[in-house]
Amino acid sequence: MDNILLIDIGNTAVKWTFNGEYHSVLTVNFKLDLLPKADQVFASCVGDQSLLSGLNNVVFATSFDQFQSFKSAYDTPQDLGVDRFLTMIGAMHHYPDQNIFLIDAGSALTFDLVLANGKHQGGLIMPGLGVL
């Protein structure tokens, strides 16, 4: 079985999981040598993508206007941040056929509503708790 490294680069922190272990470090303290060696690397990035420069074979996630039953409220996939997109896809996986209201409280506060049929109704982004 392949060793898969999942990385999330946010505005404030870099988080990763590998073989069931979760790690997080502030972006300003992140160095590539903190990451374990992996056969496959997948990353979500709303922060500084160059933090992974020098890491080979990284597959960066992108937003899509449609994915399986998900249908974005935005006409242009790039208008929906990959972090919000992946959160909605994950929530739909864990709570199928249910209306889902998502709140993400990170550097920014985001709110999104996805109906049971997968139709994204839109969302809101505002400054995070540390800024308010």
Give, region by region, the residue ranges found by the protein language model.
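Nucleotide/phosphate-binding catalytic cleft detector across ATP-hydrolyzing
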Residues: 1-17, 21-101, 117-131
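C-terminal, flexible cofactor-proximal segment of oxidoreductases
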Residues: 114
